[in-house]
Amino acid sequence: WWNLDDARYEIPKNGNKHSMFAGALWIGGVDAGGQLKVAAMTYRQGGSDFWTGPLNTTTATITPDECNEWDKHFKITRSEVEDHVANYLDPTYVMPDIIENWPAHGDPSQGQDFNLAPFYDAGQDGGEYNPYDGDYPDYNISGSNDNAKLFGDQTLWWIFNDQGNIHSETEAEPLGLEIHAQAFGFTADNEVNDMTFYNYKIINRSTLPLN
């Protein structure tokens, strides 16, 4: 929503109106020993509690190199996926890079979860993402996929965690969270056209339950 100096949450585009300066998740939990653990952010001027990338599912850790590798947003549109579903068998079809390289799976050498970015397994490849066999990022293209996990007409998807380094913002103990996030918007002829929405899947990768 901002670039560390100026507001960037501008809606509508080129309207020079910024309804938000900064925003972040604030998450806290208490373990069985009564220890409070927190991950939260304000303006990133005093530190950070969050870093990019998926955690090792066994150790709830991540290397700095992996954080850097995942320091990105994956931008996709529903129309790109609709076109892919309609034309992937056409020999003249050129598959968009975002569909071909959709981050569906984690890196097993880093202990990451096999399933990351959601996709529809149209080819029934045993859960392996293969867009050349008709698989696609998981919008409800058919109209009957009520379990679809991607929303909107344009979507930004990314992963972040609270284990990439010490919590220099709150100075609290980490929770061991891996968070799958998406920001999305719709093309509409009403107020929804000028809105954005957010969805977070919050996973506790630590070995301890938190309340």
Predicted regions and their residues:
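A long-range scaffold signal marking pre-active-site subdomains of enzyme folds
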Residues: 1-211
